[in-house]
């Protein structure tokens, strides 16, 4: 089964929904998609600083790839193996979380929860688009398949050449960014970022990715979540629904 089936199922239901909240969410989702597609065309001078910092972070981590791989593989333990094996199911859990959050909010008529689910799905979709495109374009060999961090085979769909960037990490940081922006409670913020960081570390520990893959994935996810959270459709106030009051008219009979 497709690992992202829960999210695809959710999007299908959202786009076919006919209730008032779903119609509103459908229009907001279309607005988000349109703006996300044209966002690269609006790149301007203020974007150069975060871009430069991101490229510097990825480049710097590249020179630490082998050291971090050696350190992580030389310090494996049976207990840590069991703990970090959980990342195997993370993508399915993340996709299901987005869908379940949305439909719970819809069923409970909870606007904030419903919109959180929609934002999680939008962030998931945005980072996945960037992540899958880069994997195909870069074609970097995974550490488990080769011995060098500079082995590239662009436009290769083989799993062994889909190392850059880390998809698990980009997913984790996209969801963490949305959750952190959605809550004022410091405990939830710390939990979200801590779990995202643990997912990133697990990919290195399990020898699935180089450090620079994880750094790139974290940055992609973070900026995807920030874009979603700042989008105009996600910063507006809840709509006001007017419920008609039933009137009773009595006519006295003489």
Language model features: what each stretch is:
Residues 50-57:
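Alpha-helical transmembrane segments
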Residues 65-75:
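Membrane-interface helix-loop junction between the first two transmembrane segments
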Residues 98-102:
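Well-ordered alpha-helical segments within folded domains of soluble proteins
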Residues 36-39, 71, 82:
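Residues that form generic nucleotide/phosphate-binding pockets
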Residues 57-67:
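Alpha-helical transmembrane segments of multi-pass membrane proteins
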Residues 77-84:
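Active-site-surrounding "flap" and adjacent substrate/cofactor-binding loops of secreted or lumenal enzymes
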Residues 68, 86-87:
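A generic structural signal for nonpolar/aromatic side chains embedded in well-ordered alpha-helices
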């Amino acid at each position: 089964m497709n690992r992202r089936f829960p999210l695809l199922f959710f999007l299908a239901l959202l786009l076919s929904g006919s209730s008032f909240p779903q119609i509103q969410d459908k229009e907001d989702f279309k607005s988000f998609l349109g703006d996300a597609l044209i966002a690269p065309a609006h790149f301007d001078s203020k974007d150069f600083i975060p871009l430069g910092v991101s490229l510097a972070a990825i480049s710097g981590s590249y020179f630490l790839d082998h050291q971090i791989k050696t350190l992580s593989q030389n310090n494996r333990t049976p207990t840590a193996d069991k703990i970090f094996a959980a990342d195997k199911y993370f993508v399915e859990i993340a996709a299901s979380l987005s869908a379940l959050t949305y439909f719970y909010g819809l069923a409970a008529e909870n606007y904030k929860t419903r919109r959180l689910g929609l934002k999680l799905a939008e962030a998931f979709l945005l980072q996945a688009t960037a992540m899958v495109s880069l994997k195909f374009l870069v074609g970097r060999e995974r550490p488990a398949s080769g011995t060098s961090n500079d082995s590239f085979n662009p436009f290769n769909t083989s799993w062994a050449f889909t190392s850059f960037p880390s998809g698990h990490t980009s997913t984790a940081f996209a969801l963490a960014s949305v959750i952190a922006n959605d809550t004022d409670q410091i405990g939830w913020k710390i939990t979200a970022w801590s779990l995202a960081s643990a997912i990133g570390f697990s990919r290195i520990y399990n020898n699935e990715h180089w450090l620079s893959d994880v750094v790139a994935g974290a940055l992609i996810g973070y900026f995807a979540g920030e874009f979603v959270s700042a989008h105009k459709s996600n910063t507006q106030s809840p709509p006001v629904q007017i419920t008609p009051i039933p009137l009773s008219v009595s006519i006295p009979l003489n």
